[in-house]
Amino acid sequence: MKSVSTLGSHCSLQLLKGAKDEGFRTLLVCERRRERFYRRFGFIDELVLVDGFGELLGDECQSVLAENDSILIPHGTLVAQMSPDQIESIGVPVFGNKWILRWESDRSLKERLMREARLRMPRSIDSPGDIDTLVIVKRQGAAGGKGYFMANSEEEYESKRLSLIESGVISTDEDLYIQEYVPGVLAYLQFFYSPLKADIEFFGADQRHESDIEGLARIPAPVQMGSSGIPSFNVIGNSPLVLRESLLEGAYRMGEDFVEASSRLVAPGMNGPFCIEGVYGDDGRFTSFEFSARIVAGTNIYMNGSPYYGLLFDEPISMGRRIAREIKSAIAEERLDETVT
């Protein structure tokens, strides 16, 4: 029997609990400073201790994973801490499509894929001098909202950028992405595409809680006006969101279009979990500003199954367990090569 492995962060507990529930041996690549915490959980069979996650690429760590016949599950920490070249160089099988993680990290590739999928998107702003409306400025890759800021003009953009550089949050040469800010109800739509069944599943939706931008809503406007600080969008946690049933058909359609576009642009396509992120406007239409081409941390709120998976399965299934079940089925059907890269 193969083993399942991942990095000790993000959603690793959900992933390895799901793998253990499906009968797999589990390995966690764990930073030494967090060893005591992860040893609390009996479903983790082995800790592969490292000083930093960059050691995942080293011969020693790769050998341990290979000796355990392991399949590595990528998540946001992998995308945040490693370059696309590094991810693509991983020697053990990676669940899903490791090549599409480059498209998640690169803003121009990300926009190209979203346009190909016919997703409704906010306007991107080419340069600070073109800012003519409220914008949100983002970093490349999976930064978890850290270093994001809003601006109404080039002057405000430059002032806030300089402040973040001086505080060490962003670097001087960091390539920032400027996007029109679209108001609405934030929704992070979670999907799973099974290449074995050639079918898409809507897993659920969540909202993210960000500090300290959320706390500002509890401060009276006159006090806010007197503040010179830059609010942060650092993600602290997630909460569940159940969509109106009339919106579900559109959510499925977006997921299907995204999978089809992915198969055309970055073979073998969008296999496994992914998330389309955006806002619902007052007309009920969804505007997408991001996608994540792997499991997202928002699935952690459904560790005992989501409301929508309750409609598809007769037992509680987390996204971590759904991934493990796909691997298990692929092994049984001798189709593992269709689920890993």
Swiss-Prot record:
**Protein's UniProt keywords contain ATP-binding:** yes
Keywords, alphabetical: ATP-binding, Ligase, Magnesium, Manganese, Metal-binding, Nucleotide-binding, Purine biosynthesis
A Pfam family recorded for this sequence: DUF1246
Any idea which positions bind ATP? 132-188, 210
Q: Which residues hold 5-amino-1-(5-phospho-beta-D-ribosyl)imidazole-4-carboxamide?
A: 10, 77, 238
Give one GO molecular function term: magnesium ion binding
Residue sites binding Mg(2+) per the record: 277, 290
* Reactions performed catalytically: 5-amino-1-(5-phospho-beta-D-ribosyl)imidazole-4-carboxamide + formate + ATP = 5-formamido-1-(5-phospho-D-ribosyl)imidazole-4-carboxamide + ADP + phosphate
- The residue ranges of the ATP-grasp domain are 106-317
PROSITE patterns the record matches: ATP_GRASP (PS50975)
| SUPFAM superfamilies listed in its UniProt record | Glutathione synthetase ATP-binding domain-like, PreATP-grasp domain
Q: What does the note accompanying the cofactor annotation read?
A: Binds 1 Mg(2+) or Mn(2+) ion per subunit.
Q: What is its EC number?
A: 6.3.4.23
Annotated metabolic or biological route of this protein: Purine metabolism; IMP biosynthesis via de novo pathway; 5-formamido-1-(5-phospho-D-ribosyl)imidazole-4-carboxamide from 5-amino-1-(5-phospho-D-ribosyl)imidazole-4-carboxamide (formate route): step 1/1
The cofactors it requires, by name, are: Mg(2+); Mn(2+)
Q: What does this protein do?
A: Catalyzes the ATP- and formate-dependent formylation of 5-aminoimidazole-4-carboxamide-1-beta-d-ribofuranosyl 5'-monophosphate (AICAR) to 5-formaminoimidazole-4-carboxamide-1-beta-d-ribofuranosyl 5'-monophosphate (FAICAR) in the absence of folates.
What protein family is recorded? Belongs to the phosphohexose mutase family.
Question: Could you tell me which HAMAP family the record lists for this protein?
Answer: IMP_biosynth_PurP
Report the protein name in the record: 5-formaminoimidazole-4-carboxamide-1-(beta)-D-ribofuranosyl 5'-monophosphate synthetase
